[in-house]
Amino acid sequence: MWRNILGRASLRKVKFLSDSSSSGTHYPVNRVRGILSSVNLSGVRNGLSINPVNEMGGLSSFRHGQCYVFEGYATAAQAIDSTDPEDESSGSDEVNELITEMEKETERIRKKARLAAIPPKRVIAGMGAQKFYMLKQRQVKMETEEWERAARECREILADMCEQKLAPNLPYMKSLFLGWFEPVRNAIQDDLDTFKIKKGKIPYAPFMEQLPADKMAVITMHKMMGLLMTNAEGVGIVKLVNAATQIGEAVEQEVRINSFLQKKNKKNATDKTINTEAENVSEEIVAKETEKARKQVTVLMEKNKLRQVKALVRKHDSFKPWGQEAQVKVGARLIQLLMENAYIQPPAEQFDDGPPDIRPAFKQNFRTVTLENTKTSRRYGCIECDPLVLKGLDKSARHMVIPYLPMLIPPQNWTGYDQGAHFFLPSYVMRTHGAKQQRTVMKRTPKEQLEPVYEALDTLGNTKWKINKKVLSLVDRIWANGGRIGGLVDREDVPIPEEPEREDQEKFKNWRWESKKAIKQNNERHSQRCDIELKLEVARKMKDEEGFYYPHNVDFRGRAYPIHPYLNHLGSDLCRGILEFCEGKPLGKSGLRWLKIHIANLYAGGVDKLAYEDRIAFTESHLEDIFDSSDRPLEGKRWWLNAEDPFQCLAACINLSEALRSPFPEAAISHIPIHQDGSCNGLQHYAALGRDKLGADAVNLVTGEKPADVYTEIAARVLKIMQQDAEEDPETFPNATYAKLMLDQVDRKLVKQTVMTSVYGVTYSGARDQIKKRLKERGTFEDDSLTFHASCYAAKITLKALEEMFEAARAIKSWFGDCAKIIASENNAVCWTTPLGLPVVQPYRKPGRHLVKTTLQVLTLSRETDKVMARRQMTAFAPNFIHSLDGSHMMMTAVACNRAGLSFAGVHDSFWTHACDVDVMNTILREKFVELYEKPILENLLESFQKSFPDISFPPLPERGDFDLRKVLESTYFFN
């Protein structure tokens, strides 16, 4: 460009830099020199392809770090005289035109120079770009190819068996899967072949045709086993309607993920929507189109063109959502084929000369249940597995496909209701559980309004975790040796007592009772074993990863949860002990202090209620035990097993031991998340809402020498009232008898559950049952009638003590209940918007029934009706509203911590960060709590009710106290 511009100037013989020019002609000269001298090409050489020009005096060469202006051109131009009279008059315009072009070119070079000066983005999500894209490819494969991988593994093993003519030595459950795979796959394929003959006559045919038979077989087997492991009805049994729905959902999901492979063009049979009939297109054509699409996707994947891949999926994803009716029809048919073709055979030594005992692995049964608090009973179909399948169920986790594993790279940022988190697996920002009104409101809410919620969920999802290999290794050792340690369930069943002779009716009656108790205990153990196996299998899958992430979403109230269901930080002590932050930070002086406090908190047993200095003293007095726990966790004194949270305590012991043994303890690296927990957090929110001084004192909204314990204070109030009642005359005051009996029973543990659940609107009957359970555990009274009446009295006194201490909370709860009652009486659901802009709709509506005829039986699907459950809307509003506030506080804290450079994880009312950052997090969480409650929350709520329901008259807001919220900023034990 420069060559062209200056070349044109020389050809026109423009005398534009002559010494004899007038003052007017010096303007272009100065302008040119200004342009040329201002072009800072420093450092551009590497970024741009600019070759030096050596003509007409030459362009001085560019040097790295320097810039020379075009001095030679000025000299040459001065030597040129015009020989054309017309050039004299037109020269000025020509020069200006050339200078304008030079200015444009200069700006272009400057722009390129600025871009070249910016280093390329070689770090993404804290890792090199190449590594990030490699992990991204793995993540996409994890989401899209797991079922295909499982099916391929079965095919390969079967092919290998045919070739070798030998049965491979496989684990028990894997051999079952393999034995079922071929007959189930063939049965499904027979169905698919039949569909081609009976076109349009089988209602579920168009759905099943969209996936290969082997993949449907694998999905059916794995989903069924997963449901039998984790189902609410008990291990080894699952409601047919639940199983059919979930298997149908899984098949639909896999069709959706892989739709671009079978829907390459609209002429293909599998491009039909659910309302169209499949055309008889040859398998060869479908295979060619599938392979073509597969290659296209592979090329895009190799180039990290994920957006193009997703666009391709959307382009070919033309089918409509199936709907629950279609899902259960597909699921029921697949379950039927599984039951008809999956068999099990006891080991050969279990039978003598007779034929082998081959029997179905699964069978359909019917159960009758009485609905809670009613005399109505309902019969439902269920699927049960054979005892031999049940026997291996708790060992099957390692052979199962587990969907929604933690992600290898940060989740996609949330940008819409179903846009965010996973790349291909369906992800929704809110768990609506089929509540149509909530789903509709969420979809209609402007993105800008939801930005604070999205940012908080993205922040939680971007926290990087890893497996604590030392703790996992120990857990595996304990589990391999039968469990029973650190809260792990016994891997062996309780022996069932032998049946006695029926002549002795008393013995037989006792045997039936003991047998029933043993069977129940074994079922509970089995369920716990399955749960632990699933958690450990996820840990084993992720242990060699450098790090991983948990995408989060919210429930309808706005509380955040990880999408992955098994191994996450919201789980048990086992989960939390196995997990740690991926990033390590030096402890520092403050971090070393907090690590010691953390050990005392995890040990608990009253130690966690002491002042901080006393907790530190406790830890320091047990350093020998801590070192021993770290060095010889099983062979030593096992001090860590006495902790309330043993595996988390062990992880902290290992970290503290490493730090104290290093030359510079404060420089030791820590990955342990340190917890700061709220003090009966629901009551903290009530005290702040009501500006309640007495309540604020009880739940640490104001500072004290040591943490206030609300449970102990309530117990003390209860005891004081009972002491007064015990002095009354039983003749005139019958409760005096129960007061005397209860005096020795009142303690923190007796009232704790009732105080905790008071936030959730615990009723008198609920409190009575809680206290009765505690008394039965202690074996206080042999007479059941006496236990019942004593519990009634104690519940009444406990609720009275709570109302006295938290008067403002009681008034606010009553106001919540009154408002909800009025709204629900008009057949409206209670709705509100959280301080972060999340719309909340209470989902409690009377269920309707929809009958669906399947190949197994007529199934009853639950359908939401327009009629609200008025009482549930009323009783649930107070706790749901408080939960929406604690969710808002956690999200506000998460975002602020992230902006301050802290790693953050949250479990509702428990906030976690690195030891060295606890002080900063403590400051932030207090500031955010004050910021939250400085807003007119109740006033805004009332205003929203009045706008939504203008024809309803609402009661006035309750009176509030004069507690100074700013005191929270100075409260040492607000969260501790």
Swiss-Prot record:
First-tier enzyme category under EC: transferase
Enzyme Commission (EC) number: 2.7.7.6
Location relative to the cell: Mitochondrion
Catalytic reaction list: RNA(n) + a ribonucleoside 5'-triphosphate = RNA(n+1) + diphosphate
Gene3D superfamilies xref list: 1.10.287.260, 1.10.287.280, 5' to 3' exonuclease, C-terminal subdomain, DNA-directed RNA polymerase, N-terminal domain
UniProt GO molecular function: DNA binding; DNA-directed RNA polymerase activity
UniProt-listed GO biological process terms: DNA-templated transcription
Protein role: DNA-dependent RNA polymerase catalyzes the transcription of DNA into RNA using the four ribonucleoside triphosphates as substrates.
Protein keywords: DNA-directed RNA polymerase, Mitochondrion, Nucleotidyltransferase, Transcription, Transferase, Transit peptide
Organism: Arabidopsis thaliana
Active site (record annotation): D677, K752, D909
Gene Ontology CC annotations of this record: DNA-directed RNA polymerase complex; mitochondrion; plastid
Homology family: Belongs to the phage and mitochondrial RNA polymerase family.
Name of the protein in its database record: DNA-directed RNA polymerase 1, mitochondrial
A Pfam family annotated for this UniProt entry: RNA_pol
Transit peptide: 1-42
SMART domains for the chain: RPOL_N
